[in-house]
Curated annotation (Swiss-Prot):
UniProt-listed Pfam families: Ras
Propeptide positions: 211-213
Essential cofactor(s): Mg(2+)
Catalytic activity: GTP + H2O = GDP + phosphate + H(+)
GO CC, one annotated term: pseudopodium membrane
Protein name: Ras-related protein Rab-25
Function: The small GTPases Rab are key regulators of intracellular membrane trafficking, from the formation of transport vesicles to their fusion with membranes. Rabs cycle between an inactive GDP-bound form and an active GTP-bound form that is able to recruit to membranes different set of downstream effectors directly responsible for vesicle formation, movement, tethering and fusion. RAB25 regulates epithelial cell differentiation, proliferation and survival, thereby playing key roles in tumorigenesis.
Main location, first listed in the record: membrane
Binding site residues for Mg(2+): 26, 44, 67
Keywords: Cell membrane, Cell projection, Cytoplasmic vesicle, GTP-binding, Hydrolase, Lipoprotein, Magnesium, Membrane, Metal-binding, Methylation, Nucleotide-binding, Prenylation, Protein transport, Transport
Residue positions of motif Switch 2: 67-84
Organism in which the protein naturally occurs: Mus musculus (Mouse)
Membrane-protein topology: Lipid-anchor
Residues that hold GTP according to the record: 21, 24-27, 38-39, 43-44, 70, 125-126, 128, 156-157
Length: 213
């Protein structure tokens, strides 16, 4: 998957980062979009997003990655944050089990506000701190499988699997968009919701993908 300028693209995919404060969402965002990492743990209050345009086959896709930037501390995330999102990374800190214990609540909130067809990846961040691990890979992988989520462990610090996590989500979104585009001749608008929202997914629509590298 190559890079393109942000001015030249065929699709825009909104992807949201959710999870408890301090799990590394902002650094995952900056690592993917700017290849940067900040050791400063101060929390920025507000909603922010960054973009990066990538190639999926012959299509240029502008990934618009949204970060809660601390609002999760105050339960202040609104439905507007989720509106229009076609992908989500649900992030927990694999060295703090309490951040994993609440992923089910985050998942419920996501599904309460987003389209039913949204692509979701569970992300166990801070894999570089393996000796401090509190969440076994197998446990998180099983949760992902049981809930039809993708799953990866990442390290925003040393870049492990960060690129793969975002690429995998974007490819899953693109596959759904392409399928919907082929099945629809009535409109040129591309979303993952509309007629599909609220319906039970068909065979193969929700599939888990536990990736261990």
């Amino acid at each position: 998957m190559g890079n393109r300028t942000d001015e030249d693209y065929n699709f825009v995919f909104k992807v949201v980062l959710i999870g408890e404060s301090g799990v590394g969402k902002t650094n995952l965002l900056s690592r993917f979009t700017r290849n940067e990492f900040s050791h400063d743990s101060r929390t920025t209050i507000g909603v922010e997003f960054s973009t990066r345009t990538v190639m999926l086959g012959t299509a240029a896709v502008k990934a618009q990655i949204w970060d809660t930037a601390g609002l999760e501390r105050y339960r202040a995330i609104t439905s507007a944050y989720y509106r229009g999102a076609v992908g989500a990374l649900l992030v927990f800190d694999l060295t703090k089990h309490q951040t994993y214990a609440v992923v089910e609540r985050w998942l419920k909130e996501l599904y309460d506000h987003a389209e039913a067809t949204i692509v979701v990846m569970l992300v166990g961040n801070k894999s570089d701190l393996s000796q401090a691990r509190e969440v076994p890979t197998e446990e998180a992988c099983m949760f992902a499988e049981n809930n039809g989520l993708l799953f990866l462990e990442t390290s925003a610090l040393d870049s492990t699997n960060v690129e793969l996590a975002f690429q995998t989500v974007l490819k899953e979104i693109f596959a759904k968009v392409s399928k919907q585009k082929q099945n629809s001749t009535r409109t040129s608008a591309i979303t993952l919701g509309n007629a599909q929202a609220g319906q039970d997914p068909g065979p193969g629509e929700k599939r888990a993908c536990c990736i261990s590298l």
